[in-house]
Amino acid sequence: MKFSKLSLTLALILTQALLVVCGKINEDFMENGLESHALHDEIRKPIDTEKADAERGVLDCVVNTLGCSSDKDCCGMTPSCTLGICAPSVGGIVGGLLGRAL
C-alpha cells in the first residue's frame, strides 16, 4: 500500500494540530479547573422556576395516577389510554407489536 508524500504530510499536519488543540484545552483546565468547564457554567445558571413547577406538576400527576380510565388520566404525556395503561402511539412494526401486546 503506497501513500503519496502529500497525504502523509497532511496526516502529520492534522495530527499536530489536534495535539495542539488538546494541549490548549488541557492547559486551560489545569489553570482554571472546573471554573472554565461548561458544566460549571450550567450549575451556576439560575433555576427557571416556571419550568420546574410545570415539571413538578407532571410528576405529581404521573405518581398519583397509576392506571387510567380515559385519555385525560395520562397527564398529557401520551395520547391514549389503552386497557388501563397510558400507551404512546408508535407507528410501524413496533407500534403493531405494542398494540397487540396491550
From Swiss-Prot:
Expressed by the venom gland. Residues 24-56, 100-102 form a propeptide. Pfam families: Toxin_23. The presence of a 'disulfide through disulfide knot' structurally defines this protein as a knottin. It comes from the Eukaryota. GO terms for cellular component: extracellular region. This is Omega-hexatoxin-Hi2a. The modification Leucine amide is found at L98. Its main location: secreted. Belongs to the neurotoxin 15 family. 02 (omega-actx) subfamily. InterPro entries: Omega_atracotoxin_CS2, Toxin_23. Disulfide bonds join C61-C75, C68-C81, C74-C86.
